[in-house]
Amino acid sequence: MSHEGQEELLDYSDSEEIAVPTTTAPSAAAGEGANDKEADKKGSYVGIHATGFRDFLLKPELLRAIGDCGFEHPSEVQQVCIPQSILGTDVLCQAKSGLGKTAVFVLSTLQQLDPVPGEISTLVICHTRELAYQIRNEYARFSKYMPDVKTEVFYGGTPITRDLEKLKNKDTCPHIVVATPGRLHALVTEKSIRLNNIKSFVIDECDKVLEAVDMRRDVQDIFRNTPHQKQVMMFSATLSQEIRPVCKKFMQNPLEIYVDDEAKLTLHGLQQYYIKLDEKEKNRKLSDLLDSLEFNQVIIFVRSTQRANELNKLLCSSNFPSIAVHSGLPQEERIERYKSFKEFNKRICVSTDVFGRGIDIERINLAINYDLPNEADQYLHRVGRAGRFGTKGLAVSLVSTKDDEEVLEKIQSRFDVKITEFPEEGVDPSTYMNT
């Protein structure tokens, strides 16, 4: 496995299993309008429980940062996971996109962190550079009142010498490392990173990281270079029965949290439709949708980097200013485009599945499957970009082949959801736009 330029990123017991029932509640921080700067400051989680974050007895610095983000009450996942995770319990958590899984490990690791110059205490592994970048930003905003805490992100496609410079200097060596498997494995192999003080070992989107044999081997090598006594936490929106035992081999008596286990695709407020048409009709239909539908930001999923580039060029030439993000771009360009879209410089993004997992951009409220994914689980990750926790959203899938029809059937069967045909009269904006 290459240690640089990773494109698709990212032996040890019985467990306690908890199934958390799904609960819905009105949004505590309703989504803002497209041009409302307040959206950058306010969180989008819904208050599920009466319990507030203060009841977790978190550090005052963390509570202050949480307040600045606009979060008042923990989500159901946070309510169950945080009290156990801050005690050092191993955690395996599966919950739908947008339920605040990232905040669980960010807050719990910061709560337990006692920064020592030159010592890495927390290691977070994820499968793409964009997700690593996003997790680093989450650490930055929750540790804003903890000035001694340093976080760095390491991923392939950038000069490894920059990583080495940061790691060998005690003043710049981070306490928290967020990394993709290939680059991290390269640093471990070259003995350029010291993991002997790791207290928290986290894998986000763990199924994606551990399903591929070569990636799993890299993670196992990294894991063996950490202390035996440490906390291990793994999170994903989808955890098949087959991958769970693999995850648990890294853990000791983990607390297992399965929210809506193998169950309904009930992303609160998400409207889902399909449109049957010929392949050659897709471009015209897409133009019609972008013309007729109201949206803050839209993400359009395609199956390949070539199709992403071609569709992006077509949209721009048709007066739909868009941006394309995919694994075929040079590393710096890819990150810059991701940042540009997140900062609302463009309202339309054409992407491959590199944006299909974990990426959280609050203003996205429309997801279009120009090409349907090959697997039902990937559909969940894609449409989860719209209608993030506590907000409304709309998902439209273009169905043009027999294979597409089979995938659509699998999605409805897998998640016990009814995806209806897009109505001729269109969709009422009030059903998917936040007021």
UniProtKB/Swiss-Prot annotation:
Domain of life: Eukaryota
Enzyme class: hydrolase
Entry-linked Pfam families: DEAD (PF00270), Helicase_C (PF00271)
Domain Helicase ATP-binding as annotated: residue spans: 82-257
Motif (Q motif): 51-79
Compositional bias per record (Low complexity), positions renumbered to this chain: 19-33
GO molecular function: ATP binding; ATP hydrolysis activity; RNA binding; RNA helicase activity
Gene3D superfamilies: P-loop containing nucleotide triphosphate hydrolases
UniProt keyword annotations, A-Z: ATP-binding, Helicase, Hydrolase, mRNA processing, mRNA splicing, mRNA transport, Nucleotide-binding, Nucleus, RNA-binding, Spliceosome, Transport
Location of the protein in the cell: Nucleus
Positions of ATP binding: A95, K96, S97, G98, L99, G100, K101, T102
Comp. bias regions, Acidic residues: 7-17
Keyword Transport among record annotations: yes
Catalyses which reaction(s): ATP + H2O = ADP + phosphate + H(+)
Annotated region (Disordered), positions in chain: 1-40
Domain Helicase C-terminal: 269-430
SUPFAM superfamilies named among the record's database cross-references: P-loop containing nucleoside triphosphate hydrolases (SSF52540)
Transport found in the keyword field: yes
Domain-related comment: The Q motif is unique to and characteristic of the DEAD box family of RNA helicases and controls ATP binding and hydrolysis.
Role noted for this protein: ATP-binding RNA helicase involved in transcription elongation and required for the export of mRNA out of the nucleus. SUB2 also plays a role in pre-mRNA splicing and spliceosome assembly. May be involved in rDNA and telomeric silencing, and maintenance of genome integrity.
Family from the record: Belongs to the DEAD box helicase family. DECD subfamily.
Protein name (record): ATP-dependent RNA helicase SUB2
Organism whose genome encodes this protein: Debaryomyces hansenii (strain ATCC 36239 / CBS 767 / BCRC 21394 / JCM 1990 / NBRC 0083 / IGC 2968) (Yeast)
